[in-house]
């Protein structure tokens, strides 16, 4: 059964798009048609931005305090929760995320995130009186930045939408969302939840389409801030556009994270964590630790342990509960990953995988492990975004840190050791926005983001609300 959407959600209503073009959505595991949606044009995007601007002027939204916004966020969370299974299944069909992962990260985690920001909104301090050294008083306000243009990637389409929507709404902004063209069906489920929750018209608008309308959104005169998650190359283009406009932007971009395995590491713990820390979502996670740094004295042991684990992973349909690694999100991306694997066979020693799977249909690649990898090689330096691990030898902890930091990226990382305090000492030396000790899982109460070519700004945590606010000082002089 296919799902055919004819309308878009703009201004709190389901309206017919001006564009007559359509986009087909395929099942990543079977290549079968699962749905179609409008492919919107710039005129459709203009209507969405206008609706968001009207919401910023309307007392139904602009007139609410933090407690009022919190009530809307909680109702939205409840409506999303009722659609949890539908959301998870939708994502798994479209991008190949194993259903067990989608249940957690594209459903349960998203609901928790909305409720977390509802709590923050409820206790938000939006104005404070500060005494001046001159004897007067100044009111310092934190106002919403205005209309936010949010551009969403295909790898975690629900979670990364809510990473932006929840803090923006908590701050009092209105949002125009441009989902990835490959994962659109889930955005319709979120829009249905927003409608059921009774969010004021124009507070959230969803406009599906290609990169052209995304560019139009970024440079639109009615947009006050841009939030983007995606590739570093696209992020640079967006950063340049926002710089010309002096428009604030949050960018969460690529990564090539390192896992530093120390001499005293518990290898069993490392192996248990690999599906989350290194192969999550079939390797299609920006923070994945795909460079495994192993000490020379335990190098062969680490290689054998990882090879044994990865070779046993069940590869199959994303909706199969037994699947550990599903397909890539598209045929083009599968081909890109496969090219990197072929490149790697000339740069390093292939230990596991290296080819396509036995499936007749679907965009699958074999989980692959390379050993004897030089950190200067392309497979160690470029983001592959697939289930491909590179194991790199180091001679001492200083060299391990040096190798980990020798990357244009700096988003994630892990340190593996039975000495917790020492692991934290190593983590402090890593040039990256986030580091996990003996595992990796972003914390919704802590800022998430990268350094260097992995982006600018932070999402998650209370800090994220500040990204959607601007300061105003009111001098009380008489």
Curated annotation (Swiss-Prot):
Role:
Involved in the degradation of the monoterpenes beta-myrcene and limonene. During anaerobic degradation of beta-myrcene, catalyzes the NAD(+)-dependent oxidation of geranial to geranic acid. Seems to be specific for the trans-isomer geranial, since it does not act on the cis-isomer neral. During degradation of limonene, catalyzes the NAD(+)-dependent conversion of perillyl aldehyde to perrilic acid.
Q: What is this protein called?
A: Geranial dehydrogenase
Phenotype reported upon loss of the gene: The deletion mutant can grow on acetate and perillic acid, but lacks the ability to grow on beta-myrcene, limonene, perillyl alcohol and perillyl aldehyde.
Question: What organism is this sequence from?
Answer: Castellaniella defragrans (strain DSM 12143 / CCUG 39792 / 65Phen)
Q: Which reaction does it catalyse?
A: (2E)-geranial + NAD(+) + H2O = geranate + NADH + 2 H(+); perillyl aldehyde + NAD(+) + H2O = perillate + NADH + 2 H(+)
Reported induction: By the monoterpene alpha-phellandrene, but not by acetate.
Q: What is the lineage of its organism?
A: Bacteria, Pseudomonadati, Pseudomonadota, Betaproteobacteria, Burkholderiales
Q: Which UniProt keywords apply?
A: NAD, Oxidoreductase
Q: In which pathway does it act?
A: Terpene metabolism; monoterpene degradation
Q: Where is this site: Transition state stabilizer?
A: 155
């Amino acid at each position: 059964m296919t799902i055919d959407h004819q309308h878009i959600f703009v201004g709190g209503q389901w309206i017919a798009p001006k564009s007559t073009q359509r986009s087909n959505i395929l099942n990543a595991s079977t290549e079968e048609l699962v749905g179609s949606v409008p492919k919107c044009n710039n005129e459709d995007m203009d209507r969405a931005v206008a609706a968001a601007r009207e919401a910023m002027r309307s007392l139904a939204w602009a007139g609410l305090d933090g407690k009022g916004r919190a009530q809307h966020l909680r109702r939205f969370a409840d409506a999303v929760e009722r659609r949890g299974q539908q959301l998870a299944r939708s994502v798994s069909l479209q991008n190949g995320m194993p259903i067990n992962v989608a249940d957690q990260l594209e459903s349960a985690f998203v609901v928790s995130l909305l409720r977390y920001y509802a709590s923050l909104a409820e206790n938000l301090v939006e104005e404070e009186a500060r005494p001046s050294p001159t004897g007067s008083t100044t009111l310092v306000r934190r106002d919403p930045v205005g209309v936010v243009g949010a551009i969403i990637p295909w790898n975690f389409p629900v979670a990364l939408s809510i990473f932006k929507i929840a803090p923006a709404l908590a701050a009092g902004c209105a949002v125009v969302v441009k989902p990835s063209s490959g994962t659109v069906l889930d955005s319709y489920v979120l829009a249905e939840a927003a409608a059921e929750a009774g969010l004021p018209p124009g507070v959230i608008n969803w406009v599906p389409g290609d990169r052209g309308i995304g560019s139009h959104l970024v440079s639109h005169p009615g947009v006050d801030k841009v939030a983007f998650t995606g590739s570093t190359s696209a992020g640079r283009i967006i950063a340049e556009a926002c710089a010309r406009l002096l428009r604030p932007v949050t960018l969460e971009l690529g990564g090539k994270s390192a896992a530093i395995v120390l001499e005293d590491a518990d290898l069993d713990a490392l192996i248990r964590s690999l599906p989350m820390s290194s192969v999550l979502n079939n390797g299609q996670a920006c923070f994945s630790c795909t460079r495994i740094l192993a000490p020379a004295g335990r190098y062969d042991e680490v290689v054998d342990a990882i090879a044994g684990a990865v070779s046993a992973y069940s590869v199959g349909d994303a909706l199969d509960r037994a699947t550990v690694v599903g397909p890539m999100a598209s045929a083009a991306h599968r081909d890109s990953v496969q090219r990197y694997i072929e490149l790697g066979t000339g740069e390093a020693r292939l230990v596991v995988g290296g080819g396509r799977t036995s499936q007749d249909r679907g965009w699958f690649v074999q989980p692959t492990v390379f050993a004897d990898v030089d950190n200067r090689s392309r497979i160690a330096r470029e983001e592959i975004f697939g289930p491909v691990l590179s194991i790199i030898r180091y001679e001492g902890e200083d060299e391990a840190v040096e190798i980990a930091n020798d990357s244009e990226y700096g988003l994630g990382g892990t340190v593996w050791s039975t000495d917790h305090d020492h692991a934290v000492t190593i983590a402090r030396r890593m040039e990256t926005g986030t580091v996990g000790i003996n595992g990796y899982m972003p914390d919704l109460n802590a800022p998430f983001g990268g350094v260097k070519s992995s982006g600018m700004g932070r999402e998650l945590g209370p800090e994220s609300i500040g990204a959607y606010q601007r300061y105003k000082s009111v001098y009380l002089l008489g």
